[in-house]
Amino acid sequence: MSDQIQLIAPDDWHVHLRDGEMLKQVVPYTAQMFRRAIVMPNLRPPVVTVEAAKAYRDQIVAACHPNWGFTPLMTAYLTDDIAPEEIERGFHEGVFTAAKLYPANATTNSAAGVTELRHIHGVLLVMERIGMPLLIHGEVTDVDVDVFDREAVFIERSLKPIRDRYPGLKVVLEHITTEQAVDFVGSADQNLAATITPHHLHINRNAMFAGGLRSDFYCLPVAKRERHRLALRRAAMSGDRRFFLGTDSAPHARPGKESSCGCAGIFNAPHALESYAMAFAQDDKLDKLEAFASLHGPAFYGLPVNEGIVTLQRDDKLVPNVVNGLVPFHAGETLPWRLQPCT
């Protein structure tokens, strides 16, 4: 195995950058590793207007050094009463790259999300017509559905009807966690894709309970059984262009993360690419990493491939237990790869 690999500069197709002081702390990790990132809109209040997206984009850009060459790609937060005209205007003005569907109360700051798909029928028709991607947090929230089954049930109950009713709509099922999601996306046409996180390639649901209750491994969707983790690895490393990188890095301050009712989210941004590289190397699939990290996403979104390269050097790197007051994924572990600056 080579001691060095070079990749076309990658993108992160799903990240939470937060806002305010938290944004200033976390955005450098993403902006110095990736050239572009799809930024989630679940702020308080959520990003539901073109003006709000512009203001948020300005806040992100202000926190970045110009030499990083980073471009945030903004998304709209869909609600029951969002206007189709606002979505279309934001897309045509180059402000909204995509729109995000959060089922109401499915995850962090999703209380204002969509309660029933019929409420956004007009929006989805417009998005289908103009070629605007729909990004989906694919879980049902019914109390009678087991938390480990919520993604699989969502596919049957909601995603299949969306695909049937809006066949021309471009859809990304984000941060997939199940074999069912892999199979559904893998059997679909070019209008359906999925992002895969680094943590779901490394952990199964046992990680949350290893030696106690491990809140730093709690995210939504939750990690599943080992067979699902292995299915995600096969998908990510298959070379199938329907699967691409999306970290879902989701930082939370430690008091909220480590409380009796801890927040869902894993902060993986500081070492995301090294984490992916470790997984791909473990399965002897490093030759598939560039397509997953740098090529498949732009192809789906209809964007140019980045210029420049990044280099990963085989060199042990100890992950700190805490960075900027946040606990990172792989805290206390040694990663076998080290990212060199983008050129």
Curated annotation (Swiss-Prot):
GO BP field: 'de novo' pyrimidine nucleobase biosynthetic process; 'de novo' UMP biosynthetic process
SUPFAM superfamilies, per database record: Metallo-dependent hydrolases
Keywords for the protein's UniProt record, in alphabetical order: Hydrolase, Metal-binding, Pyrimidine biosynthesis, Zinc
Binding locations of substrate: 16-18, 42, 137, 220, 252, 264
Keyword Zinc among record annotations: yes
Residues the record marks as active site: 248
EC numbers on record: 3.5.2.3
GO annotations of cellular component type: cytosol
The protein's role, per its UniProt record: Catalyzes the reversible cyclization of carbamoyl aspartate to dihydroorotate.
Protein name: Dihydroorotase
Organism: Synechococcus sp. (strain CC9902)
Gene field: pyrC
